[in-house]
UniProtKB/Swiss-Prot annotation:
A Pfam short name: Proteasome
Protein name per the record: Proteasome subunit beta
Enzyme kind, highest EC tier: hydrolase
Annotated Gene3D superfamilies: Glutamine Phosphoribosylpyrophosphate, subunit 1, domain 1
This protein's UniProt keywords: Autocatalytic cleavage, Cytoplasm, Hydrolase, Protease, Proteasome, Threonine protease, Zymogen
Gene: psmB
Length: 224
């Protein structure tokens, strides 16, 4: 039996901020099951999460993690830290290792004491703290190539956003299980900001316009 699956997601750290981006396509075997699949979730005021893999498993994790974050805030009066949230998720996944959640997850957050934090987790609870960038899903090999070529830890947030979108766009062009739009979030000391489709489209148009100008200049040089 085929289940709905999510695909390419990207996370990166730059200039004291975390950027998360995902595509919107959910596939079921060779069928595009959903063109508006939600793969980017706000867990807390300073934490967001991306999903790739089984949609049902991932949504169950999101519900559980969101409830735990709210419960933590009720008990302590503080927001749960990104590290504590990632560790909790790692423990949940590991405790279910014999019947694993079929999903890969990226947690991005901002710790008011330690700054931007990024974690990747596998279905068995393996957790890595990422110091630069990470990607998950079937389109991740393509996304990694773009990230490797363009990443700079000290790049401003605006350039980091463009790089994340370029990585997603490249994956969507080459991976059949990725596509149908992009979701984007930036996490800073101000909190989680999830971008509207119109804002993302505007940035993508700027990237495309800049790319066309570079191509035109190269063509002119060759013709000379």
């Amino acid at each position: 039996m085929d289940v709905m699956k999510g695909t390419t997601t990207v996370g990166l750290i730059c200039d004291d901020a975390v950027i998360l981006a995902t595509d919107k396509r959910a596939s079921m075997g060779n069928l595009v099951a959903d063109k508006e699949a939600k793969k980017l979730y706000k867990i807390d005021d300073y934490i967001a999460l991306t999903i790739a893999g089984s949609v049902g498993d991932a949504q169950a994790i999101v519900r559980l993690l969101t409830a735990e974050a709210k419960l933590y805030k009720m008990r302590t009066g503080k927001n749960i830290s990104p590290l504590a949230c990632a560790t909790l998720l790692s423990n949940i996944l590991h405790s279910n290792r014999y019947f694993p959640f079929l999903t890969q997850l990226i947690i991005g957050g901002y710790d008011l004491l330690e700054g931007a934090k990024l974690f990747s987790l596998d279905p068995l609870g393996g957790m890595n703290e990422e110091k630069t960038f990470t990607a998950t899903g079937s389109g991740s090999p393509i996304a990694y190539g773009v990230l490797e070529a363009g990443y700079d830890r000290d790049m401003p947030v605006e350039e980091g956003i463009k790089l994340a979108l370029k990585a997603l766009k490249s994956a969507m062009e080459r991976d059949t299980y990725s596509g149908n739009g992009i979701s984007l979030a930036v996490i800073t000391k101000e909190g989680v900001k999830i971008f509207e489709d119109e804002e993302i489209e505007k940035i993508l148009n700027e990237i495309t316009s800049k790319s066309k100008k570079k191509t035109t200049k190269r063509s002119r040089r060759k013709s000379k």
